[in-house]
Design a protein with these regions (language model features):
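Aromatic-glycine hotspot motif
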Residues: 1-203
Length: 203
């Protein structure tokens, strides 16, 4: 199987995205390190989707983005060329279902943690502040980006309630715009380009 990838890097650290497996990515200190992790990532992704794993794959870099961001902290601003194209209704329904499944599964994982304030991780500061260390901090951080991501594509959303509920409401707000499938590319915060396809990948 050929895995088409977008390579985002700052000359040191790498983020490698599998274009046709929306949301799948690896990170490494080098491109080679990220490539080595990709087969396990794709197999895990396919299992999560209820599909069969693959036994062999070829990694092909189809796009490169040189960045000045802190890639080692998963800071990213890339917009794939493929994320500029309009969506069909069928594509949107499929990608929305994945984004909602992700929220639902994340909530189930969070709910399964007995002590949501326990941590064994050391304190560490990144571009956005302290790294979330407890289950509660990780959950709140992930839930709270709902407002931010939707706002970047001019959609009014919130992060009230649980992560699934607020994400579902965000999509309902998006769908009130009759032209949302046009996938307009917008200049968001810090000069970063955003589209609906990018938001779906980031979720």
């Amino acid at each position: 199987m050929t895995i088409n990838c977008v390579w985002e890097h700052n000359g040191r650290d790498t983020l490698l995205y599998a274009v046709d497996f929306v949301g799948a990515y690896t990170r490494g200190e080098t491109l080679e390190a990220a490539v080595r992790k990709m087969q396990a990532e794709i197999c895990s992704y396919l299992k999560w989707c209820g599909k069969k794993a693959v036994t062999s794959m070829d990694i092909v870099i189809i796009e490169e983005k040189v960045s000045e961001l802190a890639i080692c902290d998963a800071d990213s601003d890339v917009l794939f060329e493929s994320e500029k194209a309009p969506l069909t209704a069928e594509e949107y329904i499929k990608l929305k279902a994945l984004a909602l499944k992700s929220a639902q599964d994340f909530l189930a994982l969070y709910d399964s943690v007995p002590d949501k304030n326990a941590t064994a991780a050391p304190e560490r500061k990144t571009f956005y502040g302290q790294v979330p260390r407890t289950a509660n901090e990780m959950y709140e951080h992930t839930k709270n980006v709902n407002t931010y991501y939707f706002a970047e594509i001019a959609v009014d959303a919130d992060h009230d309630g649980n992560i699934y509920e607020c994400r579902k409401r965000g999509f309902e707000s998006l769908e009130s715009n009759p032209d949302f499938l046009q996938n307009t590319v917008r200049k968001g915060s810090y000069g970063e380009d955003w589209s609906l396809r990018k938001v779906l990948r980031r979720f």
